[in-house]
Each structure stands twice: as structure tokens, then as C-alpha cells.
Amino acid sequence: MEIKVDEGHQKGTKEDITRPLLEEDKDFPDIERTTWIQKAIGQTFQTTAHLANLLPTGTVLAFQLLSPIFSNGGQCDLVSKIMTSTLVAICGFSCFILSFTDSYKDKNGTICYGLATIHGFWIIDGSTTLPQELSKRYKLRFIDFVHAFMSLFVFGAVVLFDRNAVNCFFPSPSAEALEVLTALPVGVGVFSSMLFATFPTTRNGIGFPLSSK
């Protein structure tokens, strides 16, 4: 008995075998595509992690720890929004003011932290007093204000990368606002990294690596 095979069915089977799998859904590669904004975000996440090292460690950790709690995971009511705003303001002020702090190691190897002033160096705990000539080396300079404001901008970029904070302040952003929220921290990160690389800080204050001085 001869078994006849439908030539049309056989031909279709061969075509199915030889046809590339992805050809069945030509739209599938679209899933793999990323916009220029997404690529920029991916690169800037690494930049932000590097820039976070330029900020006081305790301040960044405090913000990252408390942000999801204060913002209720990004689902803010009036109280949560006030708490999150207060957290951002306090951490931002901390980044700014700690840029003027420095450390000093005395003859006994004790680390003393202080605040740079226009007259010299003020030891915070008052445990010691530096000689006038040595104190003048730590006095306030113009570059300290540059670093302070740049630290504030960097912290702002860190806040914009925090989804809890962004969803709290901008729960339903428009398309234009979303573009700004996405592109702004990228620009701040690149600009700040260039300035910090060009004008590196010589201070080792609170929340920064200890000074060898």
C-alpha cells in the first residue's frame, strides 16, 4: 500500500523548518531596542555611583535609607511629601556645609575635625587649638564654595535618580517634564565630574576619607 503525502503540506513543513524563527515576528527586535535616554541613564548610573563618593558618605546613606520610608515607597500624601521635602533639604544642607569641614591629625595621632573659616581653622570639639601659621593653611577659600555648590548639584542628581523621591514629587509628569527629569541629572553628572576632576578638593572633612596631614 502506498501512502501519499500531501505535497503542499510537505512543502509547508520544509518552509517552516528553514524559516528563521525571528522572521515569524518581525517586531520582536523592538523589545531589545533602547532609546538614547535609556542608554544615557545606564551610563549615568555608574557616573552617579562615582559622584556619590564625592559626597559625605553618611548623608548619602541616610537619604537612601530614609527616602523609601518617608516617601511611602513613592506613594506620597501631604504628610509624606512634607517629610520627604524635609529629608531632601536637610541632606542637601549637610552636603553643602560639610564641604567646608576638614580634618587634622595631631602629634598623638588623634584625628580632629574642624570647620574652615575666613580666619583659619576652628576645631569643632575644642579639644585643641592650632598655631596661627598652621591654622591659616586651612582657611576658607573661593574653591571651597565651588565644591560646596557642586556637591549640592550632585546631591540633586542623586535625588532625581531616586524613583521614590521622583514619584513623590512628580506622580504624573508630562512628556516634557519626564524628558527634563531624565536628561537633567545626566547633564549635572557630566558637568560636575568635569569640574571635580579639574579642580579636585584638598579637604578631608566629616564623611570623607581621613586626612594624612
Swiss-Prot record:
It comes from the Eukaryota. It is found in: Vacuole membrane. It is a multi-pass membrane protein. Expressed in leaves, flowers and siliques, especially in vascular tissues. Keywords: Membrane, Transmembrane, Transmembrane helix, Vacuole. The chain crosses the membrane at residues 51-71, 78-98, 142-162, 180-200. Its main location: membrane. Involved in membrane remodeling. Belongs to the plant DMP1 protein family. This is Protein DMP4. It comes from Arabidopsis thaliana (Mouse-ear cress).
